[in-house]
Amino acid sequence: PMFHANAWALPYSCALVGTKMVFPGYQLDGKSLFELFETERVTVSAGVPTVWLALLQHMGQNKLKFSTMNRTVIGGSACPPAMIRSFQEDYGVQVLHAWGMTEMSPLGTVSTLKSKHLDLPKDSKLAIQSKQGRSIFGVDLKIVDDAGKDLPWDGKAFGNLLVRGPWISNGYFKGEGGDPMRKDEDGMEWFPTGDVATIDPDGYMQITDRSKDVIKSGGEWISSIDLENAAVAHPAVAEAAVIGIRHPKWDERPLLIVVKKKDSQVTREELIKFFDGKVAKWWMPDDVVFVEQLPHTATGKLLKTKLREDFKDYKLPTA
């Protein structure tokens, strides 16, 4: 019951309102999911991007449409904008992007549009939906630099994300790992999430990386998530991961690791060129590697520790 944020607390909230719950069990392939959704007439779903990737690929290859599903909550890891667009424009499914942690019991933020956003162009709305969103009642957020100094809510500065609230953990079982809490200059205690994020003037938070996954190049930070999101927008890319590879001059440089869609072809040069205009020049990957599959945790997140181990001796062409 305590596995992965206790199923996002859905067993409790659904029971409270008398909602039927449908569980897929171990059959998380696209075909099985689609058949389950249709048979059980699912209207609302919740899951991680990796699961929805398999579902959307199956539906796209077989030209299928949902008959009942109209909303989905996506969390667990950052949802690529291309996935949100596909759900909404190709299948008429409204996406709610959310973020939280088991330590937060579990919900922290939800990305819903404010009234002033409703008349914005589609791309502008998508940019807002792609953020993890605003904090729910009872949860406070802030971002700080490595010295603990508060950073501005300007949507540009990114730093270590801290949270606090009445139902947020202040430690671990039997004190494992020591006291995680951070005190600010006013003596307030904050829980460090391990995420790096920005917060815009409207309070929308966006995860740019896990602190351990940020690529530190020439003294600056590069977001692996932003690069992955840009890569999966390419029509030939099924899934992508970006890790930092040691570089003699820049300390680290990004390596893009790609799984191609079935029967699709794309070259290293085409993918690197695809980043033109989407990210800063110095963010662009130094190299691309194609693989059959990427490693994932039991909860569907990319297992970057395994990728870093597999590619620890990789030599970049720019090194």
Language-model segments: what does each one mean?
Residues 76, 100, 133, 195, ...:
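Active-site glycine-centered loops adjacent to acidic/histidine catalytic or metal-binding residues
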Residues 45, 165, 170-171, 188, ...:
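AMP-binding/adenylate-forming catalytic core of the ANL superfamily
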Residues 1-4, 77:
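Conserved AMP-binding
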Residues 16, 39-47, 56-127, 140, ...:
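Gly/Ser/Thr-rich phosphate-binding loop
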Residues 92, 124-129, 154, 167-194, ...:
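Conserved ANL (AMP-binding/adenylate-forming) active-site segment centered on the GW(Y/F)…HTG consensus within
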Residues 310-319:
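Acidic/polar alpha-helix N-cap and adjacent early helical turns
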Residues 135-162, 181, 201-202, 264-268, ...:
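Conserved beta-loop-beta connector loops within the AMP-binding
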Residues 3-43, 58, 113:
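Conserved AMP-binding/adenylation subdomain of ANL enzymes
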